[in-house]
């Protein structure tokens, strides 16, 4: 019975951003791309990218080009948490500053239209432990250590 079954080739879901696949996104101009983005990102691109943002966009392809084949590119560090992730940034490694350290972020196609800062958390999430002295009325009966 196993011989008669035809093995199905595994198919992976192809990435699309609002119905447009990544290859077409890369070929689009900024004006066409802006029509797909949300209002906040449209406004950002419409007002133009500043010099710092332009220099980041120049450094990312350079790092990708210098990387050996089948290897991840060198990390490009930046403080630009407000940079909109564009399709040409996909596949790059970016070190996003969170106020203390640079968090490495690998740009994936699903991140298009988001900001770099969304992927580098600026605070340490709270780990709730035992209550301290005077936290509640019942804490009077909690022994000290």
UniProtKB/Swiss-Prot annotation:
Annotated Gene Ontology cellular component terms: cytosolic small ribosomal subunit
One Pfam family linked to the record: Ribosomal_S19
Subcellular location: Cytoplasm
Gene: rps15
Complexes and interactors: Component of the small ribosomal subunit.
Protein source organism: Xiphophorus maculatus (Southern platyfish)
GO biological-process terms attached to the record: ribosomal small subunit assembly; translation
SUPFAM superfamilies, A to Z: Ribosomal protein S19 (SSF54570)
Keyword terms: Cytoplasm, Ribonucleoprotein, Ribosomal protein
Annotated InterPro entries: Ribosomal_uS19, Ribosomal_uS19_CS, Ribosomal_uS19_euk/arc, Ribosomal_uS19_SF
Location, primary (coarse class): cytoplasm
Family per record: Belongs to the universal ribosomal protein uS19 family.
GO MF terms held by the record: RNA binding; structural constituent of ribosome
Described function: Component of the small ribosomal subunit. The ribosome is a large ribonucleoprotein complex responsible for the synthesis of proteins in the cell.
Name of the featured protein: Small ribosomal subunit protein uS19
């Amino acid at each position: 019975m196993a011989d008669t079954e035809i093995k199905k080739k595994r198919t992976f879901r192809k990435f699309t951003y609002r119905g447009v696949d990544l290859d077409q996104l890369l070929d689009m101009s900024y004006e066409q791309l802006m029509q797909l983005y949300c209002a906040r990102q449209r406004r950002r691109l419409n007002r133009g990218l500043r010099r710092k943002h332009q220099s980041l966009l120049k450094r990312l392809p350079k790092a990708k080009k210098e990387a050996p084949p089948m290897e991840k590119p060198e990390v490009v560090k930046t403080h630009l948490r407000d940079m909109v992730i564009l399709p040409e940034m996909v596949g790059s490694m970016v070190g996003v500053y969170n106020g203390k350290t640079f968090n490495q972020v690998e740009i994936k196609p699903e991140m298009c239209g988001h900001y770099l800062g969304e992927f580098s958390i600026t605070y340490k999430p709270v780990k709730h432990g035992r209550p301290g002295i005077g936290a509640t009325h019942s804490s009077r009966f909690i022994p000290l250590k």
